[in-house]
Amino acid sequence: ITSIEEMENEPSLGNGGLGRLAACFLDSIATLGLNGDGVGLNYHDGLFLQKFTDNKQREEKNPWITDNSWLTKTDVSFSVPFKDFTLQSVLYDIDVPGYKNGCNRLHLFDVETVDEGIIRDGIQFDKKDIAKNLTLFLYPDDSDEAGQLLRIYQQYFMVSNAAQLILREAE
């Protein structure tokens, strides 16, 4: 069964309470034949992989974006200004088909400048370099001020992109 599970990487979109709820909403809306797209961030690494070495837990990054991913890169891009810098977004879409009926989309925004090379030991990285880490991890450690600020930047980036996408589609 392991070889079957490894044939298609799980994007972890339905993991956790909110992720599962969002996936169910998108699927149900499509099944009912209603239009209703979702918006989020295109995190490069999802929930961490738990490894054990010498009877000690080690957290490793868990990349879910592979060459055969369901992500479709679009030509849509927006500028998101912050106080001291501006980030350029890249929009990816995932089709969410309903049961025997419609299909909606999950829109996932990424940054052009994300750098997986900044990952150090396991899942540690410089949380202050927003341009390089904004969409790096689904659940960055926010137990310190840098992590809390990163979460605020992530939320602002997502909301700004979502608003710009809605306005673009309303034209």
PLM features per residue range, with description:
Residues 1-171:
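A conserved ligand/cofactor-binding region detector
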